[in-house]
Amino acid sequence: MTEKIKNKNQKIITYSDSGVNIDEGNKLVSQISSITKSTSINGTTAEIGGFGGLFDLKKSGFKDPILVSSTDGVGTKLQLAIETKSYFNIGIDLVAMCANDVLAQGALPLFFMDYYATGRLNRKIALEVIKGIAEGCKQS
């Protein structure tokens, strides 16, 4: 994918022009790779940076498995995190919401698919959220 695209007026714009800082994103990935790796269980085969997750059910030890997954959000608790500048716990809570939905189906949480979206990357905040997500995965 090219870093430069043309808008309808044929003006070339870059990711940077639209507020995307690729260098900051790469620095964040470097900071969190060991954190995310610490959450791996038998069956986890994906590495950080890919655009999908891999889970080997044979390695997980289940017989005749059925996958159960959940996507959820933290809702208005996000506003509390912003107001208190406390971002670690929002990561834990995010995983807990999804893990509880999986558990309610009688299943075991095996993996967590994250999506971190922001208007502008604040690496310090992102790092705290992702540390919380990792802790939530360990607790689940």
Region spans (language model):
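Glycine-rich phosphate/pyrophosphate-binding loop regions near the starts of catalytic domains
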Residues: Q31-S140
